[in-house]
Amino acid sequence: MSTVGEIELQPWAVQLDHDARAYEEQISYLLARSPFYRERLGSAGIRQPKDAGGLAAIAQLPFTEKQHIRASCTVDNPIGAHLCVPREEIVRIFSTSGTTGTPSYIPLTAGDLENWVTTSARSYAASGLSRGETVVTTYNAGPFVAGAALAAFDRLGVCHVPVGTGNTERLMTAVRQLKPSAVVMTPSYAAYLIEWASERGFDLPGSSVRRVLVAGEPGGGEAAFRARLEAGWGARVTEAMGIGDIGVSLWGECEAQCGMHLGGRGFVHAELVDPASGAAIAMADGARGELVLTHLRHRAAPLLRFRSRDHVEVWTSPCSCGRTAPRIRCIGRTDDMLIVRGVNVFPSAIRDVVGQFLPEVSGFILVKPQQRGVAQEPPLPVAVELAKGGLARAGLADRIRDRIRETLVVSTRIELVPHGSLQRSEYKSKLVQH
């Protein structure tokens, strides 16, 4: 059973009252300390905290995007103009890999780091991790924010075995010898290990592992993909999610498996917006949109209305675990999204449909856009890898094409490729050929 903290059972309306007060303090802090936000908010006519209108009016404020932060960086201030504290108050600086080769830096004060550990511990506890059990993790503790998550396992009181990324032999030796009850990894790596174990005669469903916690990329909440992982591991699969610039792990799924709860409640405020127009979307059962996050109690470099580029589905109905925060499932990244004749298509959604054809297919796919940019002309080419041993029945490509059209309302051209021809990953899968 998962451990539920008292704050997680608090009525959501009460939480919003607390958040409203914290938000007003955060706005005051930004206007006093952040040159970046003084300029951005000032250009929107907000020069005093009262001008912001409170949490109920947050949708009137400008978004913060990654490129805005990058543009504010200088040789003398490589972190960015949103930095609010002197260097001597910073205890940790993480970095994210930059698409241009220039990393982005994420500074934390001691209080910020403590808050990250708190939210991460909540999200991991939701999955059922508890004191005394052995957990093997594959997070890298190097320069990236996942390293901050390691302290969350200490907070939970588990026997934590960090093996890092890129060493499958070491990982599986730890599973064999130390007999953990849980493992933590990306969903792509969990899928890769099913094949790895099968090829080497390792009985993964017969191992000690009873829980697989996946994070780092979308996929763990897709019905067909989750079923594939649970069958291959003989274990319950739940997922967690964070956004490096905001918090390493902010959302965690409980054992009911009906979406990830906001473990970051009290520390971040979540909004839903239309990814194209930026218009607000009400957080209600079944709503879909881009996740936008705002720090509420951050000190080093708080972010206001940060566009995550994660496209999510939301649930606000009661959960059997008693947690009252909204729940989400990540459908995909809006920067991976393609538009085919006006229809938004996420590669992860195509993978989920293809996964319904197991055991005829391996479950691995690669979308191959033909036009530069987001807009694509139909049919959209998709490589689908066959299962090992040639289990496909006649007409498989047509059946997959028809199912995708029925489910996602998009026309595809299915190319069946031999087993083993699509790249596997010990970290995150590439679903789109760029």
Language-model regions, residue ranges each:
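Short, solvent-exposed loop/turn segments at the edges of secondary structure
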Residues: 207, 264-267, 333
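Active-site phosphate/ATP/adenylate-binding loop shared across adenylate-forming ligases
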Residues: 4-6, 65-238, 246, 250-256, ...
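Detector for glycine-centered tight turns/loop "hinges" at secondary-structure junctions
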Residues: 101, 201, 277-279, 427
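Conserved AMP-binding/adenylate-forming
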Residues: 220-221, 225-318
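Conserved beta-strand termini and adjacent loop/short-helix elements that scaffold enzyme active sites
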Residues: 163, 240-242, 273, 370, ...
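Nucleotide 5′-phosphate-binding alpha/beta core
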Residues: 1-95, 101-118, 125-126, 226, ...
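AMP-binding/adenylate-forming catalytic core of the ANL superfamily
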Residues: 183, 292-408, 426-427
